Design a protein with these regions (language model features):
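Short N-terminal binding/cap micro-motifs at the start of the first secondary-structure element
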Residues: 215-217
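Conserved beta-strand elements of the Class I
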Residues: 205-207, 232
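Flexible gly/pro-rich beta->alpha loop and the following alpha-helix that scaffold active-site loops
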Residues: 223-227, 231-245
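Intein/HINT protein-splicing elements and their conserved insertion hotspots or analogous self-processing inserts
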Residues: 1-89, 100-205, 213, 222
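Catalytic core of tubulin tyrosine ligase-like
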Residues: 97
Length: 245
């Protein structure tokens, strides 16, 4: 595993070394086709790329989103416990997908059809216990309480926000975000959306409201523009100044 440039290396002030690279250009199209099929067939329940922070970070972020613990078996990936840090924190290309037990064999078969069966592993299961539990050779080697992980995950942003924004609202947001009973928004559309909407005569105008420190507004605008909207970039300061667009 190549650790050059990884988050782990950076926080330890270690520079140099070999960084990950794309070595699987020939397999990439097949991989994308399999993922697309699984998505189309609604077999994928959750998906996360292995990127900043490596495997352990991707798993933690999936737990944060679902508010569920994980029981992870490292036997398929780990030959010796001395390789544990490199395994968990390397940022080589990879993804984690969640599927139902009944869809596991089909998932393996699809990856086998493109020659990637040996690169796909069953890592474990979700758990109602609020813990990330990593096991190797039937021994518990890491046990991380989800609540403490979630607090640590948000801590740096919280400390910055306290200085930048209203500390009272920053504290409220921090407590909200780190509450494991908070399952996020679950929007329900109570009406049927027509498959075809006639917006050729005029483009509906919408404003995408953003605050300092946010990102993703350009991608959101591109998506709305693609389906016929006229998007306006609207900042919180525009509201404060009562600017008319």
């Amino acid at each position: 595993s190549r650790m050059g440039g990884s988050i782990l290396a950076q926080i330890h002030n270690e520079y140099g070394g070999t960084s990950p690279d794309v070595e699987c250009t020939e397999e990439m199209s097949g991989f994308v086709s399999v993922i697309n099929k699984l998505l189309k067939d609604k077999k994928i329940l959750a998906y996360h790329d292995r990127s900043d922070g490596g495997l352990i970070t991707a798993l933690a972020e999936m737990s944060f989103a679902s508010r569920l613990g994980l029981k992870i078996n490292l036997d398929p990936l780990l030959a010796d416990e001395s390789e544990l840090v490199d395994l968990l924190f390397n940022e080589e290309l990879g993804v984690i997908i969640q599927v139902l037990d009944v869809d596991l064999d089909e998932t393996f078969k699809l990856f086998n059809s493109i020659g990637l069966r040996d690169e796909v592993y069953n890592l474990g299961t979700i758990s109602t216990e609020e813990v990330l539990d990593f096991r190797f050779k039937e021994k518990n080697i890491i046990e991380l309480p989800l609540k403490e992980l979630l607090k640590n995950w948000h801590q740096v942003s919280f400390e910055i926000q306290k200085l930048r924004d209203n500390p009272v609202t920053a504290q409220s947001e921090y407590e909200h975000d780190t509450n494991l009973k908070n399952n996020g928004l679950n929007p329900v559309i109570p009406f049927i959306i027509p498959q075809k909407i006639n917006i050729n005569s005029s483009k509906p105008r919408i404003a995408i409201l953003r605050e300092q420190g946010v990102n993703g507004q350009n991608e959101m605008a591109a998506a709305f523009n693609e389906v016929g909207f006229d998007c306006l970039d609207f900042h919180m300061t525009d509201l404060i100044s009562k600017r008319h667009l």
